[in-house]
Amino acid sequence: MHKLPANPKRGQSQGEEISNSISHGIGLVAALVGTPFLIMHAVRQGDAGFIVGTSVFSASVILLYLASTLYHAWPIGKAKRCFRIIEHSAIFILIAGTYTPLTLGILRGAFGWTLFGVIWGLAIAGVALKAFYKTAHPILSTCLYLLMGWLLVIAVKPLFARMPTAGLFLLSAGGLSYTAGVAFFATDSRVPYGHLIWHLFVIAGTTCHYFLVLWYAA
């Protein structure tokens, strides 16, 4: 596993790290509270695709917010570097986890399973990139995040046919929120509290997709 600098980029100030940790700590609590409602709703539907999809989505959300909270709360050192790798890897898992209820619960069939396989293959590649390669560049990782997120455009036609307008709005709003936040993620070394702003966009995107899954994919 490659070594990351103890104080990446310019480093976040103590105040920034506190706000970063609190923001995603709140997101973690919300995810833990919201998950039972999501799972119970899927179970009531009695559909295996919905149950698996919502379970994977929920687990990926909890993992991301837990990893992020621990990373930003931990003091500089070896453990913090490890949490940073886990946090960045969890972004790939969250993206794939968000696809899962859509591919298994809504799209289904050969197309749904193919997209499911492709997106999880990319997620595994992204995790390996973060964990094992010294040459892993943040720009490459960010581009892969965006590629995975917007790969869903190939499914626009079947989604239009199987999802109401409100569901498509939530799907798009969540994707646009994540994408807009990437600008602050990429420039947080130059923008004070830019990483906090990124976190707020992530929370907004997750919220949109939570209600998308609750109302239309479970």
What spans do the regions from the language model cover?
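Multi-pass alpha-helical transmembrane bundles in non-GPCR membrane proteins
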Residues: 1-218
